[in-house]
């Protein structure tokens, strides 16, 4: 095997926009910023919102529902 061909794998800190700091390891070798993490993501916090897109779906069915009708 060749020596010194692999990038360095160092400990870094990933900081979320909510302020949570996650310590991990990466070949990036510099701190990174995260938009969401498990502390603030709605799926993990249980604060999910159901988006109502029924109006758009009904409008689509009105326009193109005729093409999908069975004969």
Swiss-Prot record:
<keyword id="KW-0479">Metal-binding</keyword>
<dbReference type="GO" id="GO:0046872">
    <property type="term" value="F:metal ion binding"/>
</dbReference>
<dbReference type="InterPro" id="IPR034704">
    <property type="entry name" value="Ribosomal_bL28/bL31-like_sf"/>
</dbReference>
<protein>
    <recommendedName>
        <fullName>Large ribosomal subunit protein bL31</fullName>
    </recommendedName>
</protein>
<keyword id="KW-0689">Ribosomal protein</keyword>
<feature type="binding site">
    <location>
        <position position="40"/>
    </location>
    <ligand>
        <name>Zn(2+)</name>
    </ligand>
</feature>
<keyword id="KW-0694">RNA-binding</keyword>
<dbReference type="GO" id="GO:1990904">
    <property type="term" value="C:ribonucleoprotein complex"/>
</dbReference>
<feature type="binding site">
    <location>
        <position position="18"/>
    </location>
    <ligand>
        <name>Zn(2+)</name>
    </ligand>
</feature>
<dbReference type="Pfam" id="PF01197">
    <property type="entry name" value="Ribosomal_L31"/>
</dbReference>
<dbReference type="GO" id="GO:0006412">
    <property type="term" value="P:translation"/>
</dbReference>
<keyword id="KW-0699">rRNA-binding</keyword>
<dbReference type="InterPro" id="IPR002150">
    <property type="entry name" value="Ribosomal_bL31"/>
</dbReference>
<dbReference type="GO" id="GO:0003735">
    <property type="term" value="F:structural constituent of ribosome"/>
</dbReference>
<dbReference type="GO" id="GO:0005840">
    <property type="term" value="C:ribosome"/>
</dbReference>
<keyword id="KW-0687">Ribonucleoprotein</keyword>
<feature type="binding site">
    <location>
        <position position="16"/>
    </location>
    <ligand>
        <name>Zn(2+)</name>
    </ligand>
</feature>
<feature type="binding site">
    <location>
        <position position="37"/>
    </location>
    <ligand>
        <name>Zn(2+)</name>
    </ligand>
</feature>
<comment type="similarity">
    <text>Belongs to the bacterial ribosomal protein bL31 family. Type A subfamily.</text>
</comment>
<comment type="subunit">
    <text>Part of the 50S ribosomal subunit.</text>
</comment>
<dbReference type="GO" id="GO:0019843">
    <property type="term" value="F:rRNA binding"/>
</dbReference>
<dbReference type="InterPro" id="IPR042105">
    <property type="entry name" value="Ribosomal_bL31_sf"/>
</dbReference>
<comment type="function">
    <text>Binds the 23S rRNA.</text>
</comment>
<dbReference type="InterPro" id="IPR027491">
    <property type="entry name" value="Ribosomal_bL31_A"/>
</dbReference>
<keyword id="KW-0862">Zinc</keyword>
């Amino acid at each position: 095997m060749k020596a010194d061909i692999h990038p360095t794998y160092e400990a870094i800190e990933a900081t979320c926009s909510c302020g949570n700091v996650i310590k991990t390891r990466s070949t990036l070798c510099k701190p990174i910023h995260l938009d969401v993490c498990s502390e603030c993501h709605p799926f993990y916090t249980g604060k999910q919102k159901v988006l109502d897109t029924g109006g758009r779906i009904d409008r689509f069915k009105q326009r193109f529902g005729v093409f999908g009708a069975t004969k």
